[in-house]
Amino acid sequence: MSLSFVPHFFQQGSNSYKPLLKHSHHQEVTMEVGGNEFTEITLRPLDLSDIDAFMVWATDDKVARFCTWDAYTSKADALDFIKNKVIPHPWFRAICLNGQPIGAISVTRNIGNDECRGELGYALGYKYWGKGIATKAVKLVANTIFSEWPHLERLEALVLVENVGSQRVLEKAGFQREGVLRKYITLKGKTRDLMMFSLVSTDPQS
C-alpha cells in the first residue's frame, strides 16, 4: 500500500493554518486486521510522550517517499516538530492500533474566502499498509470533521499520480476523483503531477 501525499502536516516551517481550539475527543472503530483478529483503530491527539512511536514511521524512507517531508534523522528535530507544529495544530491526530500510535492524520483549514475548504493529509507505518487501517482512519475523519467545523464544506486530498495505493484508500473512504493537476508541485527536486480527490459535506457517508 502507498500513502497519501501529505500537504502540510509533516512539512517543516509550514504555517498555513489559522490556530483554533484543539479538540480532545476520542474516536473509535473496531475492525478486523487479518484472519479473525479484531483490533481497535482510534484517533487521538499526538503528544511528546509519543516520540518513540512517531520515530518508527517518521524515519522510514518508504513512508516519506510520497510525502512533502524527508524522513527524520534526528529525535530532537522530531520533538521540536511535535511541540511547535503538531500540538498547536487545529486538527492533528495519531492513528492508533490498540492504543499505540502507528501513523498520523490531519486536516489543515484554509482561511478567508477559502475557509470552506480543508486539506487532508495522512501517513501510516509501512508494516500496516494494505490492512484497511488508512481507509478506516480517513472514514473516521470524514464522518466527523464537517460537524466539528461547521464552516467546512469540502475536504480535499492531493495524491501523486503514481501513488495508486493512496488513491484506493480515498476512493474506499468515499472521496471522488476529480482529475490530474499537471506539473503542480516541485517535490524532492522533481516537478510532479497530482491527483485531486474531494469529499463535500453533502456527499453520503461511506
Regions found by a protein language model. Name each.
Residues 61, 85, 147-148:
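Generic structural signal for alpha-helix termini and adjacent loop/cap motifs
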